Regions:
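Core catalytic region of metal-dependent phosphoesterases/phosphodiesterases
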Residues: 1-67
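Conserved beta-sheet core of the metallophosphoesterase superfamily
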Residues: 58-140
Length: 142
């Protein structure tokens, strides 16, 4: 399964892309396969937000969350769902659900478990949320 996830990642992610990985990059070292073993096989610049299983690998990520504007929306990126912010991208819940809404609040699960084991991009997220298409700002690299 590891090789299939790597194949699907590289099918979608170009070397120059930036990917926000929302934690649990790899559960623990097994048979000499650690964070660096997997990382060097993946395209893109990976910004890793710490997950609850990242203590078991060598990622050394110190980032607990990221706030970023994508598609004109201020997103909060964190491993666990955060229901105190308006727009949250998370992982952690595996295949329990993909989108949770509470009034104007949205929690979107970007985990591979609910995305056919592919990384998901902002265009797919916006489409899933039935919002207008995301038009990137030409002054950014997003």
């Amino acid at each position: 399964m590891d090789m299939e996830i790597i194949r699907r990642w590289n099918e979608r992610v170009k070397p120059e892309d930036t990917v926000f990985h929302l934690g649990d990059f790899c559960f623990k070292e097994k048979d000499g396969k650690d964070f660096n073993y997997y990382r060097k096989q993946l395209n893109g610049n990976i910004i890793l937000v710490r997950g609850n299983h990242d203590n078991n690998n060598k990622s050394e990520s110190k980032i607990n969350f990221i706030s970023i504007n994508l598609g004109g929306i201020d997103w909060h990126l964190e491993h666990v769902p955060n229901y105190s912010v308006k727009f949250n991208l998370c992982g952690h819940v595996h295949n329990l659900w993909k989108i949770r809404r509470n009034g104007n609040q949205v929690c979107y699960n970007v985990g591979v478990d609910v995305n056919s084991f592919y990384p998901i991009d902002i265009h797919e997220i916006m489409r899933d949320l039935n919002r207008k298409p995301f038009i990137p700002n030409p002054n950014t690299n997003i």
